[in-house]
Amino acid sequence: MEKDPLTIIEQAEDHFIERIAENMHAFGMPSTVGRVLGIIYMNRKPMTLTELSEATGMSKTRMSQVVREMLDANIAEKVFEKGVRKDLYEVEQDYYQTFITLFSATWSKVVSKNKMMHKKLNRELLSVLDEELTPEAEEKVNELLKELKEWLDYYNWLSRLIEFFESEDIFKYVPKP
């Protein structure tokens, strides 16, 4: 017995949605965010919270939280459609742009946190050097300061890498097919 063509289509869409959810999870996003992104993406047009709630089986309250997470991560946006009174949400239809957005957001947070930690540790270690230290302790502080410099160099490099993606210069070296 052959499967109904509509069933095959629905199953294929479900597979796409699940793959998108798994990909989002790789960026540290909850799978529910990935599922909703996939649902809107596969819908190919903006959706309301009610439509999303029905598509996922989640409450409108939970759906509102998920959409807020997506808005905060810049992977969804609220759009206006003439004649529609409810808020509509859409997602980027370009996989490459979605990747750049997620990559940049994820790594920008990491860079920011680590640069703040660098400042704090650097300040603390420099103040320790003003104290009377044993030669071993002074050597250890200097090793840590050197490590901090390498750490800062790494996070500055990551900042440049993020800019490389955001400027889309990446496509000059790794073109889209």
Curated annotation (Swiss-Prot):
The keyword DNA-binding applies. It comes from the Bacteria. Residues 49-73 bind DNA. It holds the Pfam family MarR_2. InterPro entries: HTH-GbsR_regulator (IPR052362), HTH_MarR-typ (IPR000835), MJ1563 (IPR026282), WH-like_DNA-bd_sf (IPR036388), WH_DNA-bd_sf (IPR036390). GO terms for molecular function: DNA binding; DNA-binding transcription factor activity. Keywords: DNA-binding, Transcription, Transcription regulation. Disulfide bonds: none annotated. Belongs to the GbsR family. PANTHER family: HTH-TYPE TRANSCRIPTIONAL REGULATOR MJ1563-RELATED (PTHR38465:SF1). This is Putative HTH-type transcriptional regulator YvaV. The lineage of its organism: Bacteria, Bacillati, Bacillota, Bacilli, Bacillales.
